């Protein structure tokens, strides 16, 4: 890979580490590219944010390839998710402490599978209040952390499939394919509400964005060994 090719425009696949924001990952990529190729400036962007607590695929575009970002953002995504039932958190993930513990001794595997099927197709969900969505010019998570009352608007999204279901109470794991803009944290929360015992997202890994797979990230030019070796 040459400096000219990167400036002209390339698409790279990166496996984002846990507890990194997508913004931090992009900054790291810029730093590494500038250091490696002596760039003074380089345009770098990604096609779809991942929460800090999530790992997995970031599609990174450089140079003129950044024009492809909006097109890539529109394609379906796939995630591996783990949820914990019988308890909730304010953030719908592990960022906030557990609240509202509920007995789950009456919950069966068949009931969980039945509930998961209800979320196939077009659904309506509310994004978590701890999200990057802007409300009157401010990020929802900034308002929530400041103690402000935050009302999130419902949005429609599509769940294409939920498969490879593994149940080891209180944990439920599955692969989910979904449309652009789906919040898996909200899906976890809503599954818990439908079960009647609450739930939150304990692990999330993005495995695919359209035709791109996280399995390809380890062998492409911007490998994690190259990018994150100096963390």
Residue ranges and their predicted role:
Residues 1-231:
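Catalytic/RNA-binding core of pseudouridine synthases
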